[in-house]
Amino acid sequence: MSSSNACASPSPFPAVTKLHVDSVTFVPSVKSPASSNPLFLGGAGVRGLDIQGKFVIFTVIGVYLEGNAVPSLSVKWKGKTTEELTESIPFFREIVTGAFEKFIKVTMKLPLTGQQYSEKVTENCVAIWKQLGLYTDCEAKAVEKFLEIFKEETFPPGSSILFALSPTGSLTVAFSKDDSIPETGIAVIENKLLAEAVLESIIGKNGVSPGTRLSVAERLSQLMMKNKDEKEVSDHSVEEKLAKEN
């Protein structure tokens, strides 16, 4: 192992602010109900539809990421503007498939039944898989389990649906009747494609929340630039130290 690798320190946890979206507050960091890892707020936005000329908001969505997402994404995407990232399909695919934990908090603005919510989510997931040519029996069974988890649930305004996506591909589902986040989930589905598709259906190319997509792009653009600047300062300090030692 080289001396530079031996001296490398873990990336600092990103310092971010909370976000207020349509009277819903997303705190700067949360503990994942799947792993208890701290995750930072990557972005937030609304999901709504234009109904008879009026934009109706159904849910407000926050996306949280593990701290190592920033250096991982920085390798390819640092220096890109918010606009460039927002328009980049590969960038959001890398977030969706990246080897770091993700967490999604979906807070209700209007009441929804579990059946209404889960059927729409799985419909979007299946559309993504078919587009990618990835729909198999395993995914069909994962969809059945997903629908079963939600079948008897109802979600009044202010309640939340929570998803934790592990780097290994499991999807942990949890529910909250208020703003709290439970320490553990109520069910785990071991299907990597389903876990990824749930997130992609929100922030991907045809995702249901363009506002969340824009928010994630804006925040990560800033964080990657900050990470780049800090790394350059750190590298310069190491070079100075080595020069003095020699």
Swiss-Prot record:
<keyword id="KW-0413">Isomerase</keyword>
<dbReference type="InterPro" id="IPR016088">
    <property type="entry name" value="Chalcone_isomerase_3-sand"/>
</dbReference>
<comment type="similarity">
    <text>Belongs to the chalcone isomerase family.</text>
</comment>
<dbReference type="GO" id="GO:0009705">
    <property type="term" value="C:plant-type vacuole membrane"/>
</dbReference>
<dbReference type="InterPro" id="IPR016089">
    <property type="entry name" value="Chalcone_isomerase_bundle_sf"/>
</dbReference>
<dbReference type="GO" id="GO:0042406">
    <property type="term" value="C:extrinsic component of endoplasmic reticulum membrane"/>
</dbReference>
<dbReference type="GO" id="GO:0005634">
    <property type="term" value="C:nucleus"/>
</dbReference>
<dbReference type="GO" id="GO:0009733">
    <property type="term" value="P:response to auxin"/>
</dbReference>
<dbReference type="InterPro" id="IPR016087">
    <property type="entry name" value="Chalcone_isomerase"/>
</dbReference>
<comment type="function">
    <text>Catalyzes the intramolecular cyclization of bicyclic chalcones into tricyclic (S)-flavanones. Responsible for the isomerization of 4,2',4',6'-tetrahydroxychalcone (also termed chalcone) into naringenin.</text>
</comment>
<feature type="binding site">
    <location>
        <position position="59"/>
    </location>
    <ligand>
        <name>substrate</name>
    </ligand>
</feature>
<dbReference type="GO" id="GO:0009813">
    <property type="term" value="P:flavonoid biosynthetic process"/>
</dbReference>
<dbReference type="GO" id="GO:0009411">
    <property type="term" value="P:response to UV"/>
</dbReference>
<feature type="binding site">
    <location>
        <position position="124"/>
    </location>
    <ligand>
        <name>substrate</name>
    </ligand>
</feature>
<dbReference type="GO" id="GO:0010224">
    <property type="term" value="P:response to UV-B"/>
</dbReference>
<dbReference type="Pfam" id="PF02431">
    <property type="entry name" value="Chalcone"/>
</dbReference>
<feature type="site" description="Important for catalytic activity">
    <location>
        <position position="117"/>
    </location>
</feature>
<dbReference type="GO" id="GO:0009507">
    <property type="term" value="C:chloroplast"/>
</dbReference>
<feature type="binding site">
    <location>
        <position position="201"/>
    </location>
    <ligand>
        <name>substrate</name>
    </ligand>
</feature>
<protein>
    <recommendedName>
        <fullName>Chalcone--flavanone isomerase 1</fullName>
        <ecNumber>5.5.1.6</ecNumber>
    </recommendedName>
</protein>
<dbReference type="GO" id="GO:0005829">
    <property type="term" value="C:cytosol"/>
</dbReference>
<dbReference type="GO" id="GO:0045430">
    <property type="term" value="F:chalcone isomerase activity"/>
</dbReference>
<dbReference type="GO" id="GO:0005783">
    <property type="term" value="C:endoplasmic reticulum"/>
</dbReference>
<keyword id="KW-0284">Flavonoid biosynthesis</keyword>
<comment type="pathway">
    <text>Secondary metabolite biosynthesis; flavonoid biosynthesis.</text>
</comment>
<dbReference type="InterPro" id="IPR036298">
    <property type="entry name" value="Chalcone_isomerase_sf"/>
</dbReference>
<dbReference type="InterPro" id="IPR044164">
    <property type="entry name" value="CFI"/>
</dbReference>
